[in-house]
């Protein structure tokens, strides 16, 4: 879930967008506006609970500035009652935005987590990390591997940036291969869930790198115009 510029209201000097999204910045991103956004995000999560009868156990998020904004989201809204935990670290993204994972401790135990930085032409990109979190279900003990992505945008042109998005997808594909090869339950790719903002439509050419590994759950909806 891309939370779209979920910055705090302080100018911490952590990225190109940090000054813009601050109380004195061009966006006039004040504390009241920040906490209003927290409320709107929580309302969307509770809508899922109303729609499906249960709150999501796992939420992958993108475009968060730091751990603090997620802590405020969970403490300043009614989400504080539902035991969500945070997995996050600051990335080297030039805008100062990261990916993170929220999970309900009543449903999962965290086994492990790691980060991978995509490379392009042998050089690490100044982009978001790809986050891998291994969770164990408290109901049955099944292991799941969640991978949170926010691939490079089409800024500068779709064709010009395609190589960077392909490199990020190659990194994701390699991570899936590694996880499947060491699956203790012999499930292979079945316990792997990749999520996030891939900055492309579900029929993008780079998704072919995951053929035979993961199921593209958005492709049919996309073809139907949803």
Which residues does each predicted region cover?
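Active-site His/acidic residue clusters
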Residues: 14-18, 146-164
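N-terminal, active-site-proximal structural segment of metallo-dependent hydrolase catalytic domains
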Residues: 1-77, 81, 87-91, 97, ...
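Active-site environment of divalent metal-dependent phosphoester hydrolases
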Residues: 66-68, 94-96, 154-155, 199-205
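Active-site-proximal beta-strand elements of phosphoester/diester hydrolases
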Residues: 1-5, 26, 112-114, 143-153
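Structured beta-strand-rich core segments of catalytic domains in phosphoester-bond hydrolases
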Residues: 58, 64-143
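Metal-dependent phosphoesterases centered on the DNase I-like endonuclease/exonuclease/phosphatase
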Residues: 165-226
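Sec-exported extracytoplasmic/periplasmic mature domains
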Residues: 46-50, 69-79, 107, 174-184, ...
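Active-site metal-binding loops of divalent metal-dependent hydrolases
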Residues: 3, 64, 151, 197-198
